[in-house]
């Protein structure tokens, strides 16, 4: 498996997390990943958005340190870095997840 570069948890900033979560599509992605509690492909997370739009959202989520993406063949497997984020910023992500209303 090939892995995409992600920031170390020490480099993750709360302002970057909050910026990443300021978009409704990214909030939905994070909510779905949290609800699933497992790795999900981009196809499983289909939000009826163009592929380029989804790539953009995942790039921002990865840069903020919220999502980890592993490439396995042709699939991009995405997972939420919930435990790491909760350890660095206790309660922040849990509080945000409670506000997400999934369709």
Predicted regions: what is each one?
Residues 13-14, 35, 77-103:
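Conserved segment of winged-helix/HTH DNA-binding domains
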């Amino acid at each position: 498996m090939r892995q995409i570069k992600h920031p170390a948890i020490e480099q993750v900033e709360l302002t970057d997390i909050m910026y990443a979560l300021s978009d409704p599509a990214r909030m939905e992605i994070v909510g779905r990943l949290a609800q699933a509690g497992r790795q999900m492909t981009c196809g499983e997370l289909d939000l009826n958005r163009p592929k380029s739009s989804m790539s953009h959202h995942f790039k921002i989520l990865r840069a903020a340190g919220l999502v980890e993406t592993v490439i396995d063949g042709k699939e991009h497997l995405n997972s939420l870095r919930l435990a790491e984020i909760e350890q660095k910023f206790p309660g922040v992500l849990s509080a945000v997840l409670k506000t997400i209303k999934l369709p």
